[in-house]
Amino acid sequence: LQGGSAAHISYVSIVGALETATNRCLKSKSIAGDMLLKSTTKTMVLRVPMVLGEGDYASYALRRNALKSLNFLFRPSSMDQPLYAGDVVRAIKAGAVKELEGAYDLVGPEPLSRRDLIKRTASMLGRRTKVVGLPIALGLILSGLLEKLFSNPPVTRSMLEVLDHDDNMDTSHTEELLKISPLVSLDAMLEKILNTHERP
């Protein structure tokens, strides 16, 4: 980036993408962020959890699962803390205006299990769904087999490990620093994304 014209860079990473991460995906994200932070261009690394926005794949997948009468998930007790895509955009804009430097976590206002997230989404759609948990070890075995069978498998062990996480953080300091409080509530977020039915 030396000699470039950019005055500020905002790099969106993943919660847990730290130097100490053992997961390959998180580790590579951490390395990329560190490279930008060490460059001559002012950089803000923003680590976010599951992001939900109108018309995106994560929101489509959540709605699809909520409409099912039965869901099978690997460790549905894992904690999510969804963040609205519009709040990510606001954070990026605020960071650029302030030319903020450094790495920051920003998560949504409400932590809940993946099971509860699907059930709440189903309830907002006027539906009921049952979520059956599967052992994560089974998923790791299956994804390992897929890695051996396909050059570009649909899911890898590293991807599954990223999904098997627990987000339950207080990032109000980041909100205050960027002056983007309050964040969009989970219910308001779900209302926004459920009004968009198109497949991304």
Please place each PLM-identified region on the residue numbering.
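Mid/C-terminal beta-alpha module of Rossmann-like enzyme folds, strongest
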Residues: 91, 95-155, 169-200
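Flexible, glycine-rich beta-alpha linker
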Residues: 21-24, 44-63, 112
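Conserved Rossmann-fold NAD(P)-dependent oxidoreductase catalytic core, especially the SDR/UDP-sugar
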Residues: 1-33, 37-39, 43-49
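Short, surface-exposed alpha-helical segments at coil->helix boundaries
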Residues: 26, 30-33, 56-60, 115, ...
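Short, hinge-like loop/turn segments at secondary-structure boundaries
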Residues: 27-29, 61-65, 123, 148-151
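A conserved pocket-lining segment of Rossmann-fold NAD(P)-dependent short-chain dehydrogenase/reductase
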Residues: 64-83, 87, 91-99, 105
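Short histidine/acidic/glycine/proline-rich micro-motifs that form metal-
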Residues: 16-19, 50-53, 78-79, 108
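Low-complexity, charge- and small-residue-enriched intrinsically disordered regions
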Residues: 70-85, 146-170
